[in-house]
Each structure stands twice: as structure tokens, then as C-alpha cells.
């Protein structure tokens, strides 16, 4: 009897069988992010690059606007190596600003406009910005946040700056600007005009140049600024060219994600522009209107989070609509239970879509995406296969000892989209970026999962979401969520840990449930049925201690389930 030798993902790379050899062998561009967009679209300058509430910008328009913005940045004293803090939603101006800063060797520090004065102040001070760019609607908070910093000038833009003329008038009537601006404020159009006569020469390509700093809790929970380079952005876009059966020049992508997360800029702006798409900009999504926006614009592509697609599947406005235009609607940023995945896939199939929900997995530290399940290369429950130039493997948690395919461990990522590091946090950078004996730099994600024999990645849970019982048994929330979400009355569910009342240490799994709006099932009946399902399908130590019904899941500002809030909301009376 022979013993089969273990197979290791980092060596076997079984996922490569799904890719064309020309993409496996491709070299990554040695260009700035802006130059890559220009290079890819040099023969398509009259194609539409951006659509902002019906106002269209061609690629030629975009390039002109970027160069004008670059000149304007130089006009206010920005130079190579400077970091400009931007507090805004996605608008054409913010997109031009990204590429303009890139062109002159500067960096954007992207901050969520919903942050408090203290939060904005902290992020300005951390990178020592001398220039602040903000939306007019958050100017007062930004003015206060800029106190006791080195900010010298503030550029203020309005969501109306690029609206079609009639809409711009309507916006200004319904949302008048009542700010009292300080003397150091420059309005956007005045800012652009101030760049006249300044140089529009691009800085030479620098492989070490940081395009943006985006902020994340990362794997330890403390706020950190993730530095992403031109190479990170370009490598992400270049790898997506391997999905050429789905992605074709001239298609539309609706960008519903904000600019202050890597997902919003890397997948929502740079990727589609490199592929020659039209980017439909939705600066401030109302989730209830997502279905109407999909019907209005008919985008073939969209990147969102699982909650967006559950919203679409439950939207009565889409009940009898033809959605055959959908090619790649991708869910990332949060876990998608098997029940929710099946619900969304049934919805897509019933409305004429050719492919199931596309899934991806990644993190800010790898420029948002590391795996893709696109088209028919898709297994239920998985988050797809590694991108063509990316390697993923499972390791014994916290070590460099790789585990064989099929064994659960800490998922680690190695590839060209890996961040440069955390801004001014060398110790924390060293914790997550580690050179292994194979010579590669690996990102230690803090996520538990495994790869199957075909190279599909299956995600169990973040290590920090893992529930450890009093007896040391480990419970992954996804184990329970995958069972509970299949109940026909359940719209959404999330599992968190609660205190074990019978032991001095350890936690127990607690299930939150949102019922479907049209369900007629009684709550007590649903609980009895869920208890039976869990008893039949899960080990004894994984059984939930209690179930609680809520009207909706609390969400973080970027659309992920707020697990910390769910944990805080558990009362001793609930179980």
C-alpha cells in the first residue's frame, strides 16, 4: 500500500489550469497608473470613460482633466513626495485628482467623510498634509479638523461641479452651500484656473511611488494607513485581463463603492478604465435605489458587498425584469453564506443572467482582491481561485509552515498587488508581511480556510471572529451561517460569540436572524426548525446557544456586517 505524497498549493498551483498560458506568462507593466490608463486607451480616446448622472466624459476629456488638475496641484505648491488628504465621496474631480497626484509623484491620503472631527484630524496629522481637499458638505468638520495641523490650503469641491447644467442648478437650489469659508479656501474651479501656465510634465515612473494611503483596521484592529503603489494598481488591473471571456472594451461598470477603500479605487475605477469600460459613478448609494439604478444604466459589471446582492434579490421592482445584460456582479469585502449565495444565484438565473454571482476575496493590504470566481469557473461556497499572478496557500497559523491542499490553516497571499507597508508602522508591517524560506513575501491574512484540489479557496472565518469555547473547541461562524441561511424563511443571518454563563472562560455561538419580508412562518416555528437543522448537520460543540430576530443587520460605513455591534447588543436575557 502506497501513501500519497501531500500536495502544496504554492508549488502545484492547480488553479492555473483555468487560465490561458499567455496570461500566466504575462509581464506586468512598468508604468505609472495614469500612464497605464493612457496607454491602454490611446486608440480609443472618443470612447466614454465616465458617466456622472448622465454627463459623459470621454477618455480624451479624462486625460485633459487629469493634466489640468496636475497643473493646479503644482500651482498650489504640491510636489513629488507630498501627501494630499482627500475627504470626499467618488466624483469625477476625485478621479482626476487621483491620476493627477500620481502624474506628479504625489500621494492621496483618502479619508471617509463620515469620520468625526477627531478622526479626520488624526489622519491629516499622521501624514503631515499641507493641502486638504474636501466636499463642501463636510467643510466645517474639515475646517475644525485642520486646526493644529500643517494644512495651509483647503480645496473645496461640490458634488454639483460636474453635474449636467440643469441638475447642477437643481442641486444648488435644494442643497444651498451655507458655509462661511476661511481665507485659505480655494473652490475647485478657481483651483483649476490657478494651474494655468504650470507644467504638465509627468514625473518619471518610480516603482516605489505610493499612489494612495487608505485606512484599515487590518488584522489587529488598530487603524493603519495602507500604502499602495502604482504597481499594485496596475497588477490588479492586468490580472483581470485574464477574464477576457467576460470583460470587453466598451462595457459598463457601475461603481457603488467609495474612494476611501482600496476596493472602490482599485476595482471600481482603475481596473475598468484600464479595460476600456465606462465607469458609472454613484457617489452616495442609497441601497433601496440599487435595483432602480441597475435597471436605468444596465451595467454588465458591478463590484459590491454581499448585502448589495441580497438587496437586489429581494427588490420587488426587479420581479419581472430582464437582467440578461448582467455578466459579472461580484461580491467581496464580507462573507457570503451558502444560503445567501443560492438565493442570489436563483434570482439571477430566473431573470436571465448567464452567470452566477461572482465572488472574490482579498484585503486592503493586497489592493482589495486576490481571488476571483468569475463566469462558470465558480464553486458554491468558495471565494474563487487565486488571480493568475497570485499565490495563495494555507499555513499553520502565525508560522511559515505550509499545510497540504485540503488542510485548514491561515490563508497567506503572495503576489504583485501586495502593499508597500503600513504608513509609519514598521513593526506592524513586519507582523503581516513576512519573508518565508521560499524567498517570497507572504501576507498573513488572519483568515482561516483551505484550498481544494482544483485550487478553489474556501474561507472559514477571520481568526478574530473565531469563537473559542471553554473546552478549547473552536467554532467558525460560517459553519453555522451556512446551515441557518438555507432555511426558506431566513433572509440574512450572522453568528457572533457570547459569554458562557456556566464557565469562567470561553464563548458560545449566538445567531442573529433577519426574516424574509414575505415570510408567514412564526418565529418559534423557525427556531424549532433551525434547531433541528443544526442538530442534524453540525457537531454537538457547534450548536448555537440562542437565536435572536432583528429587523435588519447593523452595517459598517462600507457595507459590511458590524459584528462588534451585534456582540454588544446581546443581553443576558437573550439566552
Label every PLM stretch briefly.
Residues 58-60, 211-235:
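Conserved AMP-binding A3 loop
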Residues 300-304, 313-380, 391:
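Gly/Ser/Thr-rich phosphate-binding loop
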Residues 115, 132-134, 302, 415, ...:
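AMP-binding/adenylate-forming catalytic core of the ANL superfamily
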Residues 178-215, 222, 245-252:
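Conserved pre-ATP/AMP-binding loop-to-beta segment of ANL
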Residues 157, 536-561:
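AMP-binding/adenylate-forming catalytic domain of the ANL superfamily
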Residues 52-57, 69-115, 127, 136, ...:
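Conserved AMP-binding/adenylate-forming
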Residues 234-252, 260-303, 307, 311, ...:
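Conserved AMP-binding/adenylation subdomain of ANL enzymes
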Residues 63-68, 193-196, 207, 226-246, ...:
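Conserved structural elements of the adenylate-forming
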Amino acid at each position: 500500500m502506497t501513501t500519497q505524497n501531500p500536495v502544496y498549493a504554492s508549488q502545484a498551483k492547480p488553479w492555473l489550469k483555468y487560465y490561458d498560458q499567455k496570461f500566466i506568462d504575462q509581464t506586468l507593466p512598468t508604468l505609472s497608473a495614469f500612464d497605464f490608463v493612457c496607454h491602454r486607451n490611446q486608440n480609443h480616446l472618443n470612447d466614454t470613460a465616465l458617466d456622472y448622472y448622465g454627463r459623459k466624459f470621454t477618455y480624451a476629456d479624462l486625460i485633459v482633466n487629469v493634466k489640468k488638475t496636475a497643473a493646479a496641484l503644482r500651482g498650489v505648491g504640491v510636489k513629488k513626495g507630498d501627501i494630499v488628504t482627500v475627504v470626499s465621496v467618488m466624483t469625477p474631480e476625485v478621479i482626476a485628482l487621483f491620476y493627477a497626484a500620481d502624474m506628479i509623484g504625489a500621494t492621496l491620503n483618502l479619508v471617509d467623510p463620515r469620520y468625526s472631527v477627531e478622526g479626520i484630524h488624526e489622519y491629516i496629522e499622521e501624514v503631515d498634509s499641507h493641502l486638504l481637499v474636501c466636499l463642501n458638505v463636510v467643510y466645517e468638520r474639515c475646517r475644525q479638523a485642520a486646526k493644529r495641523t500643517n494644512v495651509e490650503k483647503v480645496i473645496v469641491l461640490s458634488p454639483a461641479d460636474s453635474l449636467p447644467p440643469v441638475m447642477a442648478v437643481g442641486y444648488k437650489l435644494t442643497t444651498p452651500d451655507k458655509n462661511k469659508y476661511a481665507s485659505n479656501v480655494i473652490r475647485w474651479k478657481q483651483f483649476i484656473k490657478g494651474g494655468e501656465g504650470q507644467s504638465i510634465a509627468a514625473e518619471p515612473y518610480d516603482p516605489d511611488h505610493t499612489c494612495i494611503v487608505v485606512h484599515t483596521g487590518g488584522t489587529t484592529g488598530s487603524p493603519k494607513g495602507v500604502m499602495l503603489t502604482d504597481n499594485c494598481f496596475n497588477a490588479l488591473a492586468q490580472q483581470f485581463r485574464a477574464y477576457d471571456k467576460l470583460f470587453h472594451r466598451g462595457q459598463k461598470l457601475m461603481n457603488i463603492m467609495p474612494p476611501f477603500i482600496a476596493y472602490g479605487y482599485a476595482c471600481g475605477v482603475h481596473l475598468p478604465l484600464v479595460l476600456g469600460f465606462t465607469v458609472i459613478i454613484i457617489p452616495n448609494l442609497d441601497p433601496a435605489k440599487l435595483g432602480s439604478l441597475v435597471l436605468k444604466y444596465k451595467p454588465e459589471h458591478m463590484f459590491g458587498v454581499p448585502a448589495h446582492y441580497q438587496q437586489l434579490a429581494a427588490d420587488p421592482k426587479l420581479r419581472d425584469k430582464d437582467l440578461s445584460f448582467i455578466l459579472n456582479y461580484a461580491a467581496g469585502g464580507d462573507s457570503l453564506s451558502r444560503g445567501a449565495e443560492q438565493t442570489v444565484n436563483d434570482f439571477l438565473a430566473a431573470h436571465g443572467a448567464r452567470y452566477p454571482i461572482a465572488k472574490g476575496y482579498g484585503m486592503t493590504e493586497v489592493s482589495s482582491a486576490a481571488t476571483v470566481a468569475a463566469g462558470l469557473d465558480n464553486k458554491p461556497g468558495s471565494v474563487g481561485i487565486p488571480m493568475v499572478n497570485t499565490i495563495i496557500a494555507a499555513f499553520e497559523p502565525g508560522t511559515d509552515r505550509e499545510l497540504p491542499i485540503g488542510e485548514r490553516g491561515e490563508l497567506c497571499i503572495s503576489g504583485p498587488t501586495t502593499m508597500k507597508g503600513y504608513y509609519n508602522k514598521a513593526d506592524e508591517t513586519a507582523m503581516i508581511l513576512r519573508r518565508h524560506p521560499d524567498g517570497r513575501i507572504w501576507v498573513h491574512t488572519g483568515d482561516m480556510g483551505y484550498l481544494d484540489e482544483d485550487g478553489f479557496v474556501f474561507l472559514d472565518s477571520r481568526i478574530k471572529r473565531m469563537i473559542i469555547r471553554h473546552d478549547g473547541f473552536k467554532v467558525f461562524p460560517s459553519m453555522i451561517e451556512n446551515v441557518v441561511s438555507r432555511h426558506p424563511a431566513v433572509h440574512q443571518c450572522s453568528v457572533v460569540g457570547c459569554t458562557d454563563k456556566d464557565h469562567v472562560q470561553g464563548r458560545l455561538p449566538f445567531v442573529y436572524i433577519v426574516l424574509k419580508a414575505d415570510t408567514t412562518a412564526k418565529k418559534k416555528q423557525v427556531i424549532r426548525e433551525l434547531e433541528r437543522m443544526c442538530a442534524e448537520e453540525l457537531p454537538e460543540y457547534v450548536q448555537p446557544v440562542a437565536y435572536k430576530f432583528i429587523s435588519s443587520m447593523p452595517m459598517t460605513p462600507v457595507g459590511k456586517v458590524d459584528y462588534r455591534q451585534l456582540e454588544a447588543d446581546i443581553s443576558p436575557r437573550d439566552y
